[in-house]
Curated annotation (Swiss-Prot):
Signal sequence residues: none
Annotated zinc fingers (B box-type), start-end: 5-47, 48-92
Disulfide bond annotation, renumbered to this chain: none
CDD domains noted in UniProt: Bbox1_BBX-like
SMART domains found in the cross-reference section: BBOX
Subcellular localization, as worded in the UniProt entry: Nucleus
Binding-site list for Zn(2+) 1: C5, C8, C28, H33
PANTHER family attached to this UniProt entry: ZINC FINGER PROTEIN CONSTANS-LIKE 10
Keywords on record: Metal-binding, Nucleus, Repeat, Zinc, Zinc-finger
Family in the record: Belongs to the CONSTANS family.
Name assigned to this protein: Zinc finger protein CONSTANS-LIKE 10
Amino acid sequence: MGYMCDFCGEQRSMVYCRSDAACLCLSCDRNVHSANALSKRHSRTLVCERCNAQPASVRCSDERVSLCQNCDWSGHDGKNSTTTSHHKRQTINCYSGCPSSAELSSIWSFCMDLNISSAEESACEQGMGLMTIDEDGTGEKSGVQKINVEQPETSSAAQGMDHSSVPENSSMAKELGVCEDDFNGNLISDEVDLALENYEELFGSAFNSSRYLFEHGGIGSLFEKDEAHEGSMQQPALSNNASADSFMTCRTEPIICYSSKPAHSNISFSGITGESNAGDFQDCGASSMKQLSREPQPWCHPTAQDIIASSHATTRNNAVMRYKEKKKARKFDKRVRYVSRKERADVRRRVKGRFVKSGEAYDYDPMSPTRSY
């Protein structure tokens, strides 16, 4: 078992971020680096599986491990590495942004067994790794018989969320603690780390839904309005073939909190606990985010400090302009500041250039036509 994620501290770290100098699991990597445009530019790669503290640069195909430069040199080029020096190694490329599962597969095509065949993978990871969403929109589980929980159909498409595609009597369901009563109540998506090919499905749509969601019109049915309200609310309905990413698309943080039960639940995504019903579900646009937060945004109204700082800047700019205008009007000619002192100094007697008092000897008298020595 490797080191824990530096962000959540619950899942095994798999990705190393060079800018943050942090080891993250796939879940936290998606949540942290999708916050803004600056974080999407961070360069990330796999974490070294030997030291768990440095970014991996090569992948050893024989040992099936990712190694940093130091661990690669000590394991393959060291003094006691005669047998391992001929191992086949491949360079690991870095990535940035929030790539999809297909893009991650192309980047790390040589190490797709990283989580699937790992003996250190938890039972929860194994169970969620088997749950996928196919193109038809039905929840399939490979290798496990699909059993549908029989419940009366309702008019709300979101109520199909309570039906799980995991068999009630299967060993996987027992390990996961999943049943028809506590699937939405006890499963927290943040605490589940998954394989690379399942990275997009869970965090593109919060968690997998059963066939009941898609039988009632697909994902687009959650956002469609009644025909009676189309005249007042001009909102185009989403396509039934919408991808899982469109389920979560918003201009701010990807936060979705909903539940099909009337009681309060603790379904969590990105660390936010949802306490809403299916009827209250809304698209995570900029307007709905303000309704969910119900907090005054600091950038809407200027504070008193901003006003004071702006006034100080205006005063300073005006003073600089006045200084420049006075500097242009300066005159550098010689002027006498005290004319009366100048007139008296021109007629006083001196000795060696200094003024003398009345009655004392002097060597220069400006009033005398001839100089006395």
